Amino acid sequence: MSKKILLAEDDEDNRDLVSFVLQRSRLGAELIIAENGQEAVDKAFESIPNLILMDMQMPVMDGWTAIPILKGDKRTKHIPIIAFTAQAKPEDKVRTLEIGCAEHYSKPMDPEELIALIRKYLAD
């Protein structure tokens, strides 16, 4: 059974880049795309991914709102969430950890670093 990664990202270029990096990594993980936080919540409840990469600033519902919903639900509270964001101030990092993120990953993306982080959370 392949692992599932949910990417919540409103920027099409970032979605395409993450998809490309995952394909090149040969992790064999299925990538599920959500373009905003509400879609991320809905798709997480539907698919129960193994890992969530969550942009913090998106339309409709942002990551700051979506993450507490996911962490407050028994179906998804166990899923590690990586804040995938351009917000890199120390207080932003602290806040993402306080709301339940396992990691805070600041954009711009370094493909090798991102894959290493994903491998860490997909390891059996």
Q: What feature does the model see in each segment?
A:
Residues S47-L53:
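Active-site beta3 strand of CheY-like receiver
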Residues E12-I32:
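Two-component/phosphorelay signaling modules centered on CheY-like receiver
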Residues M58:
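Receiver (REC) domain active-site loop signature in two-component systems and cognate sites
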Residues E9:
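Conserved acidic carboxylate
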Residues S19, T65, A88-H104, M109, ...:
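Alpha4 helix (beta4-alpha4-beta5 surface) of REC/receiver domains from two-component response regulators
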